[in-house]
Amino acid sequence: MKREQLEQILLDVQKPAQYIGGELNSIMKDKEKVDCRLAFCFPDKYEVGMSHLGMKILYSLYNERENWWCERVFAPDADMEQLMREKNIPLYGLESLDPICDFDFILFTMQYEMSYTAILNMLDLAGVPVRSKDRTALAPMVVAGGPCACNPEPVADFIDIFIIGEGEEVNIELTDLYMQAKKEGWDKQRFLQQAAQIGGVYVPSLYDVSYREDGTIDSVKPNCPQAPEKVTKRIIADLDKVYYPKQFVVPFINI
């Protein structure tokens, strides 16, 4: 999307500064010189997401790699969403203004259950098929983490990969694997099967879930040999060695 196209609608929405990017310490790169593009999506308003420490850490961590570019994405307010749909403007990354449907990864943080519908709405607004089974290509790969990922079943039909536990290490391992898959031309299924062998990674399509009559889960069983029977939560063993940013993006509006 061109910035001129965005500027035509900004006067008709509240708090337009949340949609333009370019804040102090936001990270800009040449998209022609990066090999992997990631959209870090917070399924809530800009002022909520910009106050979240986990997003700040992972945003900076991903961008430590020169050939990776992680951009921020937030759920637009109702007025902005209406105009985006009317003008056929897909959900975009704040740094480049490019549609996130063209990215390699679409990453969601699941901080609370009330955000689940926002996740689905953001996928739809991006022009990405909502259900995982309808996304057959390697990219975009839809990944979700955060505290609510420990109970993934309510949104298992929509997410390709869940990150269970602390994400600073496993997210990098997963992205490194994706880079190998992209280079060697793997299909989506092969990548998911290999990703399932990383500790803390749960791939719902590789498991069969059965339910009791009262709606509670009866069993979760792997449906392929690559999927472990039990997915272990990833924990950072030494917090003194964990990555922490030296500077944060300074928001344009009060948060």
Regions flagged by a language model, labelled:
Residues 24-29, 54-64:
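Histidine-anchored nucleotide/phosphate-binding helix
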Residues 67-79:
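A short beta-strand-loop structural module common to alpha/beta enzyme folds
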Residues 38, 55-56, 70:
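Structural motif at membrane-water interfaces of alpha-helical integral membrane proteins
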Residues 9-39, 46-47, 215-255:
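N-terminal [4Fe-4S]-dependent radical SAM core
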Residues 1-15, 65:
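Helix-enriched interaction subdomains in cytosolic or periplasmic regions
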Residues 76-224:
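Glycine-rich beta-alpha loop elements in corrinoid/cobalamin-binding modules
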Residues 45-53:
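A short, glycine/small-residue-rich beta-strand->loop->alpha-helix junction that serves as a flexible
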